[in-house]
Regions:
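Residue-level signature of mid-helix packing/kink "hotspots" within the transmembrane helices
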Residues: 50-58, 141-142, 246-250
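Cytoplasmic helix-loop-helix junction between adjacent transmembrane helices
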Residues: 101-137
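Helix-loop boundary and gating motifs at the non-cytosolic
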Residues: 4-43, 217-228
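Juxtamembrane intracellular "pre-TM" segments in multi-pass secondary transporters
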Residues: 1-3, 180-206
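Conserved MFS/SLC helix-loop-helix module at the cytosolic interface between two early adjacent transmembrane helices
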Residues: 55-88
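Extracytoplasmic gate region of multi-pass secondary transporters
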Residues: 25-26, 204-241
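Paired small-residue
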Residues: 83, 94-102
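C-terminal membrane-cytosol helix-exit motif in multi-pass small-molecule transporters
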Residues: 166-185
Length: 252
């Protein structure tokens, strides 16, 4: 497989992974109404996944720079599939919490490795690919509510999660069979954990900007669907609102 096809495949895998978040946010009102889970508990379920994702990024993800990117991608995406199935079948706070924890850790393991391989596979287009990575992440997130509103009407809460678990499983099979370019040994870093990079003020500043962006997204999306449900708005209107909120990020 040539490098352009590898990059495209990995970008689509990133988009599918991000789509999970769009689906999850738009199903919060269904969890509340069908299973009686409190809003505060739902907020905790959503938030814990971001924390476990961070743990995965600073602990295991740096191994992608040491020639293990492919293994991390397969491992991370597999954990996402497991968490996704748990979110589909779970009906209690504990089950959903564990599933979200696994899903978040999987994302924190796979996504940095996916980004790393894209950069290594096509170094001549480094800047363009960085922009494309963000665009596919946001586009995947914005597609999630559309997937929810179309599939959940026919198959209920499990439908969108099972659908995405199947899509991500296909990417696991594809990626496990292709030759993924790894970081050359002479370019592998000496730092053991990614948190060591925070000593660099420029990197720390960029991370804080990213934190503020995703803090805004997390607050808005976790409240939007619940608020629209309380206002008796149509389900499609609540879901499309999440997509419209994210679309400008794709263009910009």
């Amino acid at each position: 497989m040539n490098k352009q096809r590898i990059v495209t495949t990995l970008l689509l895998a990133i988009g599918s992974s991000s789509c999970l978040y769009g689906v999850m946010f738009t199903m919060l009102d269904d969890y509340r109404n069908n299973f009686g889970i409190a809003e505060s508990a739902l907020g905790f379920i959503v938030g814990v996944g971001f924390f476990t994702s961070f743990i995965g990024q600073v602990s295991i993800a740096p191994l992608a720079d040491r020639g293990r990117a492919k293994r991390l991608i397969v491992l991370g995406l597999t954990l996402e599939v497991i968490g996704c199935i748990g979110m589909a079948l779970g009906q209690t706070f504990v089950v959903l919490l564990v599933s979200r924890t696994v899903m978040g850790f999987g994302a924190g393991t796979a996504l940095p490795a996916l980004r790393r391989v894209i950069i290594v596979a096509d170094p001549e287009n480094f800047g363009r690919n960085l922009g494309r990575i963000l665009s596919f992440e946001v586009a995947g997130f914005a597609t999630g509510p559309v997937v929810s509103v179309v599939i959940a009407d026919f198959f209920g809460i499990p439908g969108p999660f099972i659908f995405l678990a199947g899509i991500i499983s296909c990417f696991i099979l594809i990626i496990s069979r292709i030759a993924v370019p790894e970081t050359a040994k002479e370019h592998q870093p000496t730092e053991r954990f990614a948190i060591d990079l925070l000593k660099n003020r420029a990197i720390a500043s960029g991370i804080l900007i990213g934190v503020s962006l995703f803090f805004m997204i997390g607050v808005f999306d976790s409240l939007w669907v619940l608020m629209m449900d309380d206002l008796d708005a149509a389900q499609w209107m609540a879901n499309i609102g999440v997509s419209v909120f994210a679309l400008p990020l794709v263009v910009l």
